[in-house]
Regions:
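Autoinhibitory N-terminal propeptides
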Residues: 1-52, 56, 118-131
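Active-site core segment of subtilase-fold serine proteases
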Residues: 136-220, 237-254, 258, 353-403, ...
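Active-site-adjacent substrate-recognition loops and nearby beta-strands
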Residues: 175, 267, 288-336, 347-409, ...
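Short, small-residue alpha-helix embedded
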Residues: 378, 413-429
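Protease zymogen maturation seam
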Residues: 76-162, 174-177, 398
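Short helix-loop-beta-strand segments that form the rim/entrance of peptidase-like active sites
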Residues: 212-237, 258, 431-448
Length: 476
């Protein structure tokens, strides 16, 4: 049986959130994860309207328990949202939540009259394998330079561009990498497990910072470890995490975000609605990953780039494969993805600069591309066995040692490459407005690539080295 990446990752994230029972959706499909027994609403009068509507609907249904319907909190917060409990979250399995589905149906008439959504699932926002990293990291040869290589622009504190990365924290040895000399921020909370093995997703934020620094050396990079818990956070907390990050560091020139979720909708993510309105009123440019589901379904908050009013403040980024000619097999796509950049087999700092660090693979590779592509993609190569894919099997999971740099793939990494290109444009043209730099960059420097047979705008850093792809023979 081939690996079941989404289900494997669901189990991993559920283990990281033991007190929050999760389900997958929509219904029994494996597209996103959400909190069981709860719906998310705007606080204030609207929350009361939803609570009353759900209670009335459940009272009329003999197999639904209206006694379970109550406010779960918080009563209010800066994001302007609250949770309403609609069922015992401990009941039922992981394949959907019938009570949540009924609760959402119960407010449809109210939503129709109001002209907007009033309730939503409380999704898990994450950097997981089916979301932003397209694979797991691979040790880079010690002789191999970063890719993209470091540009030659000097760092000037008087003109440097501020870049905020909201992700996992910085690894303990990041200062041993000269590329990260102008990076600061939160430390990774727990890098290794009890056996001394590197935990999954740690180093994600460090890798991202390294890509920004390589493409745009004249940057001051701040990394906030808002997603240190297996790279996941509930939507109800995500907006608060973003506000906390900008409160701690100030609104930056560029906010690089390599996390998100789909939600089966085209009108945004309720949990970040207030933050996104505040972002629009600032001068900050949000550069956000389009996600790695190989899908055209909107992935939030990146897909805000296609909503009226946010076209100038959000730039959504898909990933090119290693030769830069076409989209990577995993990249999300569609008109809501505004630009593509290299995102496959990039080389940047991870950990192990002071001493080697062991890592055991969690997911096994596939025999063929899980998205149907015909080249030797990271679904298949380099081949390895993983703990989560081979539970109960005799196959021993593969272990590697990291000694500084790694190769990694995903729209997670095409995003900081693009953020770096915007920052580099600001430096080269003495442009202080990041949104103006974005417009200028796309107008004057974007080339083209093919994604699912469609021509799309593509950005390729001058110091990035294409890596030829290997074509698979038919039937392999």
């Amino acid at each position: 049986m081939p690996p079941q990446r989404f289900h494997e990752q669901f189990d991993q994230i559920q283990r990281s959130m033991p007190d929050v029972p999760l389900a997958m959706g929509p219904d029994d499909a494996a597209e996103f994860m959400y909190e069981k027994g709860v719906v998310l609403v705007r606080d204030g009068e609207e929350a009361q309207v939803v609570e009353d509507a759900v209670r009335a609907h459940f009272t009329a249904a003999p197999d639904l328990d209206q006694e379970q319907v109550r406010r779960a909190g918080p009563l209010t917060n800066r994001s302007g949202i609250t949770r309403i409990r609609v069922a015992d979250p401990g009941e039922g399995g992981r394949d959907g939540d019938r009570a949540v589905v009924h609760a959402l149906r119960s407010v449809r008439e109210h939503e129709s009259r109001a002209g907007r959504r009033m309730a939503a699932r409380n999704h898990v926002v994450h950097i997981a394998v089916n979301a932003c990293p397209g694979d797991e990291p691979v040790p880079a040869p010690l002789s191999e330079p970063p890719n993209p290589a470091a540009a030659g622009t000097p760092h000037d504190p008087a003109t440097s561009v501020g870049v905020l990365v909201v992700d996992t924290g910085l690894m303990h040895d990041y200062r041993s990498c000269g590329l990260l000399a102008h990076t600061e921020g939160d430390a990774q909370v727990r890098e290794r497990d009890d056996r001394g093995i590197l935990q999954q997703y740690v180093g994600h934020g460090t890798f991202i910072a390294g890509l920004v620094a390589a493409v745009a050396p004249n940057t001051d990079i701040t990394v906030r470890g808002s997603l240190d818990d297996a790279g996941a956070v509930l939507e109800s907390e995500f907006g608060e995490k973003l506000f906390e990050a900008v409160d701690a560091s100030g609104w930056p020139d560029i906010l690089s975000l390599s996390a998100g979720t789909s939600n089966g909708r085209t009108d945004g993510l309720l949990g970040v609605e207030t933050f996104m309105r505040e972002l629009r009123a600032q001068r900050t440019l949000l550069v956000a990953a389009a996600g790695n589901n190989g899908s055209d379904n909107p992935f939030w908050p990146a897909a805000y780039a296609a909503l009226p009013g946010w076209e100038d403040s959000v730039l959504s980024v898909g990933a090119l494969r290693s030769d830069g000619e076409s989209g990577a097999c995993f990249t999300n796509h569609g008109p809501w993805v505004k630009v593509y950049a290299p995102g496959e087999r990039l080389t940047a700092p991870l950990t192990g600069f002071d001493s080697p660090v062991p890592y055991v693979y969690q997911h096994s590779t596939y025999d063929a591309c899980r998205y149907g592509s015909g080249y030797g993609c990271t679904c298949q190569s380099p081949a390895h066995s993983g703990v989560l894919s081979d539970e109960g099997n005799a196959a021993k999971p593969d272990q590697v040692m990291f000694e500084g740099y790694a190769q990694w793939s995903g729209t997670s990494f095409a995003t900081p490459v693009t953020a770096g290109l915007v920052a580099a444009r600001m430096t080269a043209h003495k442009e202080r407005d990041p949104r103006a730099a974005r417009r200028q960059l796309l107008a004057s420097e974007a080339g083209s690539a093919q994604v699912r047979g469609v021509g799309v705008p593509a950005l390729r850093p001058p110091t990035w080295r294409p890596v030829p792809v290997v074509r698979q023979a038919p039937g392999l």
